[in-house]
Design a protein with these regions (language model features):
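Central hydrophobic cores of alpha-helical transmembrane segments in multi-pass inner-membrane proteins
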Residues: 9-10, 46-61, 78-79, 102-112, ...
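Alpha-helical multi-pass transmembrane bundles of energy-transducing inner-membrane proteins
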Residues: 74-77, 81-169, 258-271, 275-325
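Structural signature of hydrophobic alpha-helical transmembrane segments
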Residues: 38-49, 92-104, 174-185, 235-249, ...
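Positively charged, low-complexity/disordered segments
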Residues: 1-8
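C-terminal ends of transmembrane helices
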Residues: 53-65, 107-120, 189-203, 252-270
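Juxtamembrane/interfacial segments at transmembrane-helix boundaries in multi-pass membrane proteins
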Residues: 15-33, 120-125, 136-195, 200, ...
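Alpha-helical transmembrane segments of multipass membrane proteins
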Residues: 57-58, 82-84, 107, 224, ...
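Transmembrane helix-loop-helix hairpins at membrane boundaries of multipass inner-membrane proteins
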Residues: 9-73, 153-162
Length: 378
């Protein structure tokens, strides 16, 4: 059954030409169209988004006690922004939704929701917004350069992804654009050293928001790299991929050791998420079908496992008023059902065979080992 699922997912990803779209002209003078498209990868991620927000809404019942109308309106606005990112068919529409998500994310991370309010939550929210906004400005520069040079080189005044032909843009300009975009997406993924906002935001946010941050928000960075760098600026990405793969390995190894040194459950999961997103990035850097399939598969597997881990951390905190693993001995006696659930989720998170993360990690390694960087490294 697992092999059938893998073949099915690979065929789904391979067939990228089946795109359904709808939209309208927005700013005709510069070729911007308010257009939405669904290919197979964005379809997977939109379905994943809906499911994670469903889980977060369920968890909110136990973690949110005040300002319900405002909280759920921000939750739905954030969901709409993320779905807009995954379905945008135009670069500027993508950027519009990329910036729109900052507003609800700020209030959700830093808001006062009546249960176990964290005094550090607001400062964590500000840090998240500053990091993301500064990265977005660099990303916007890359989008503007891509839009301009696509017009200069091809005579096409359009910001629609399918109208961009980067092969006629000079190589050094492609590389510059690709780096600008990677900085913006690298904040959200995150790529070390642009990761310092994440542990604080994950730790200090309410449990449902932590589930969304790790389960979906990080995937917007990986999707941006796929949509812009991997798919649109393919030649530049082939050049940059070997260097980016080194950053991916640093993500995987360094943050795994940092996670090992933590005692707060949510902080452990936060650093573990950075390590797992390094695997996603490594799969993309392989630039082959196995790596791409593994990358998407691992995004889904990591989202589900991480939501489970944060849900466990939230339940433990609601019951024990504590997340320090050094003081939680004997919890299996007090909460045996939760303990059983936690054992399964933790085994999945560390990649035990037969669980989804194990399969995606093995496929990522196979994709990376089959990567051909010989032409680039000559």
């Amino acid at each position: 059954e697992i092999s059938e699922c893998l073949v099915g997912s690979e065929m789904c990803i391979r067939d990228r030409n089946q795109i359904h779209f709808f939209g309208l002209d927005w700013i005709q003078s510069i070729g911007v169209k308010f257009i939405f498209k669904l290919d197979n990868i964005s379809m997977i991620l939109t379905a994943l988004t809906s499911f994670v927000f469903l889980l977060a809404s369920f968890a909110s019942k136990f973690n949110i006690r005040t300002n319900h109308k405002f909280y759920y309106s921000m939750l739905m606005l954030l969901m709409s922004a993320i779905l807009g990112i995954f379905t945008a068919g135009d670069m500027f529409v993508f950027f519009l939704f990329w910036e729109l998500e900052l507003i609800p994310a700020y209030f959700l991370i830093g808001g006062k929701w009546g249960v176990n309010e964290n005094p550090m939550a607001q400062s964590s929210a500000i840090k998240f917004v500053l990091f993301t906004f500064l990265g977005s400005m660099v990303m916007l520069l890359g989008i503007l350069l891509l839009h301009y040079y696509n017009f200069i080189s091809n005579g096409i005044l359009s910001a629609v992804f399918s109208d961009i032909n980067s092969s006629s843009i000079p190589d050094y300009i492609q590389n510059l654009i690709s780096i600008c975009l990677l900085i913006g997406f690298g904040v959200k993924l995150p790529i070390i050293p642009l990761h310092t906002w994440l542990p604080d935001a994950h730790t200090n946010a309410p449990t449902p928001v932590s589930m969304i941050l790790a389960g979906i928000l990080l995937k917007t960075g990986a999707y941006g790299i796929y949509r812009f760098n991997y798919q649109t600026l393919e030649d530049a990405f082939i050049t940059i991929a070997p260097i980016l793969a080194v950053f991916a390995l640093v993500n995987i190894i360094y943050t795994a050791f940092v996670a090992y040194a933590q005692t707060d459950i949510k902080r452990i999961v936060a650093y573990s998420s950075i390590s797992n997103m390094g695997l996603v990035l490594l799969g993309l850097c392989a630039i082959n079908q196995i790596g791409l399939s593994a990358s998407v598969f691992h995004m889904v597997a990591h989202a589900l496992v991480t939501c489970g881990l944060f849900m466990i951390a939230g339940i433990v905190y609601l019951r024990c008023k504590n997340r320090d693993i050094n003081t939680l001995s004997g919890i299996a006696v007090v909460m045996p059902r939760l303990f059983g659930f936690a054992v399964v989720i933790v085994l999945a998170s560390i990649g035990i065979p037969a669980f989804a993360p194990f399969i995606s990690e093995i496929l990522t390694m196979i994709g990376a080992l089959n990567a051909d960087f010989s032409d680039v490294l000559k």
